[in-house]
């Protein structure tokens, strides 16, 4: 079983989602199925079919979450240090083309959300950053073309 790197916060978030799906969403869906079943003929009962589809989706996600949690290699980022960029690092970058500053944290695939500055360890920008340090310049080939970034700051917070 291949381990999946994950921050402590990401691991806790997955556990919370699993708890919610098992303890709140599952009973709610079961109740919706029961109510829809009470309406009679199931072959043309849209509420019943929608509830069954929601149940299938929920159970699939529960299985997925259980798998990720079982394979998680939880890394406490606050205990990491060093000058070189590795999993968990928070990096401040300067886009050399636009002069725009960006801040990213390198996290596991399941916790990545670029809108809040969390990039996947397997993303092109993270792969380009790993092993680099403050002052280095990286080139990232993105769908919109190549970008050059200067690494301004590396932290483990």
Curated annotation (Swiss-Prot):
Biological process, per Gene Ontology: DNA-templated transcription elongation; regulation of DNA-templated transcription elongation
PROSITE patterns given for it? GREAB_1, GREAB_2
Q: Which GO terms describe its molecular function?
A: DNA binding; RNA polymerase binding
Kindly indicate whether the keyword Transcription regulation belongs to this entry. Answer: yes
The UniProt entry, under Pfam families, shows:
GreA_GreB (PF01272), GreA_GreB_N (PF03449)
Gene3D superfamilies listed in its UniProt record: Transcription elongation factor, GreA/GreB, C-terminal domain (3.10.50.30), Transcription elongation factor, GreA/GreB, N-terminal domain (1.10.287.180)
Record's keyword terms, sorted: DNA-binding, Transcription, Transcription regulation
Fetch the InterPro entries from UniProt.
GreA/GreB_C_sf, TF_GreA/GreB_CS, Tscrpt_elong_fac_GreA, Tscrpt_elong_fac_GreA/B, Tscrpt_elong_fac_GreA/B_C, Tscrpt_elong_fac_GreA/B_fam, Tscrpt_elong_fac_GreA/B_N, Tscrpt_elong_fac_GreA/B_N_sf
> Which family does this protein fall into?
Belongs to the GreA/GreB family.
* Job of this protein: Necessary for efficient RNA polymerase transcription elongation past template-encoded arresting sites. The arresting sites in DNA have the property of trapping a certain fraction of elongating RNA polymerases that pass through, resulting in locked ternary complexes. Cleavage of the nascent transcript by cleavage factors such as GreA or GreB allows the resumption of elongation from the new 3'terminus. GreA releases sequences of 2 to 3 nucleotides.
Under HAMAP family, the record lists: GreA_GreB
The protein, known as: Transcription elongation factor GreA
């Amino acid at each position: 079983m291949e381990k999946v790197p994950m921050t402590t916060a990401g691991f806790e978030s997955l556990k919370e989602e699993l708890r919610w799906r098992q303890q709140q969403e599952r009973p709610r869906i079961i109740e919706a199925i029961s109510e829809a079943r009470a309406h009679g003929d199931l072959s043309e009962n849209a509420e019943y079919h929608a509830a069954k589809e929601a149940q299938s989706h929920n159970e699939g996600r529960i299985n997925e979450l259980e798998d990720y949690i079982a394979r998680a290699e939880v890394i406490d980022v606050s205990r990491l240090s060093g000058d070189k960029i590795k999993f968990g690092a928070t990096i401040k970058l300067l886009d050399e083309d636009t002069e725009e500053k960006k801040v990213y944290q390198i996290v596991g695939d399941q916790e990545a959300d670029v809108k809040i500055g969390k990039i996947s360890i397997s993303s092109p920008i993270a792969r380009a950053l790993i092993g680099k340090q403050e002052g280095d310049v990286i080139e990232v080939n993105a769908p919109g073309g190549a970008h050059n970034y200067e690494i301004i700051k590396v932290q483990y917070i």
